[in-house]
A protein has these predicted regions:
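Surface loop/turn motifs at the tips and blade-to-blade linkers of beta-strand repeat domains
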Residues: 39-41, 104-105, 208-210, 257-262
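Conserved small/polar residues in nucleotide/adenosyl-binding loops
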Residues: 293-294
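A short loop-to-beta-strand structural motif that recurs across blades of beta-propeller domains
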Residues: 74-76, 141-144, 240
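C-terminal motif of bacterial Sec signal peptides marking the signal peptidase cleavage site
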Residues: 19-20
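Blade-loop segments of beta-propeller domains
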Residues: 76, 83, 87-118, 129
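Beta-propeller fold detector
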Residues: 87-93, 154-161, 252-259
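Asp-box/WD-like beta-propeller blade repeats and closely related beta-sheet repeat scaffolds
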Residues: 128-221
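Hydrophobic core segments of beta-strands in well-ordered, beta-rich domains
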Residues: 46-70, 90, 110-136, 143-144, ...
Length: 294
């Protein structure tokens, strides 16, 4: 999957470049080679995303070290005006030396994405968070905010998504079916019966009180200024799209399910000629798989 993600990053970078405006000469980006920043060090921004603001691109991503996949530094930020030459802006969101904090050093912090809120003038970061020492059990969404694009960002909270809320695309008949589902009847995974139950909302019901799981994720701001949180949920079996509040710092409770039981992650979304397109990968760990789009 790392090769796949690298290819996607190169493709997205190329697309953004052709849509941008810059008269600066560009140096070639050579696939497979170390990509240095302005200090000559490799760009350390894994699982990242690029935000364009006031003529500058900002690349946010996970700082990774050689010894662990856990977050020992936090979220890095790099800036560029041409998408080839990147300046290290430093740590945008730091993990902390406090084990009582959700973002304690050693937690798992992945897929940071940043959007700008024109109403508040704030920059808002969302990310996938797993609590220190808990593996991938927490499946939380974290949020932080800053007055400037590169940060520093102030951590606000983390948690599951839309606790106590059913998807808005579940009609009365679907809710009636949901009421009949009992997890004890589907303890064996990957059977046709289990898959059908997941499709009908088995895990939505299981997680209703505590909130929906949120792992691989992205953000999208529509033309009307409404922002959406798109994430892999329900044990990575179903994608969900959740509406964010006007300040982009919380969820409104409105969300829909996409490709139930489809087993997709790593979502990316864009709009072209009035149609929304979503690209995802399958769930095969670090092994490559075919892209899907809808």
């Amino acid at each position: 999957m790392s090769k796949l993600r690298n290819s996607l990053c190169e493709l997205c970078t190329a697309l953004i470049f052709f849509c941008g405006c810059s008269n600066e000469p560009l140096q070639p980006i050579r696939s497979g080679e170390i990509w240095p920043d302005n200090n000559g060090e490799h760009i350390n921004a894994h699982g990242g995303g690029v935000m364009y603001h006031d003529g500058t691109y900002y690349w946010f991503g996970e700082n990774k070290c050689d010894t662990t996949s856990s977050a020992m530094v936090g979220v890095m930020c790099y800036s560029s005006r041409n998408l080839t030459d990147w300046k290290n802006e430093g740590v945008a969101l730091s993990v902390v030396d406090n084990d009582s904090s959700d973002i304690a050093r050693g937690c798992i912090l992945e897929r940071p994405k940043v959007i700008y809120n024109a109403k508040t003038g704030k920059f808002v970061m969302w990310f996938h968070l797993e609590l220190k020492g808990k593996g991938y059990a927490a499946a939380r969404a974290g949020v932080a905010v800053s007055d400037t694009p590169a940060g520093p960002y102030r951590f606000i909270r983390s948690g599951r998504v839309n606790a106590g809320k059913l998807p808005v695309d579940m009609d009365g008949q679907a809710v009636a079916v949901l009421d009949t589902l009992n997890a004890k009847n589907y303890e064996k995974w990957w059977t046709p019966e289990w898959t059908d139950a997941v499709n009908k909302g088995l895990i939505v019901k299981r997680d209703l009180d505590g909130g929906q799981m949120s792992r691989d994720m992205t953000l999208y701001v529509d033309e009307d200024g409404k922002a959406y949180h798109i994430y892999s949920s329900e044990e990575n079996l179903t994608l969900q799209i959740a509406e964010l509040s006007d300040d982009y710092l919380s969820h409104t409770g409105n969300y829909v399910r996409v490709a139930p039981a489809g087993h997709n992650e790593a979502p990316a979304i864009f709009k072209k000629d009035g149609t929304y397109w979503m690209i995802t990968s399958g769930c095969t760990g670090w092994a490559p798989n075919c892209l899907l789009y809808t």
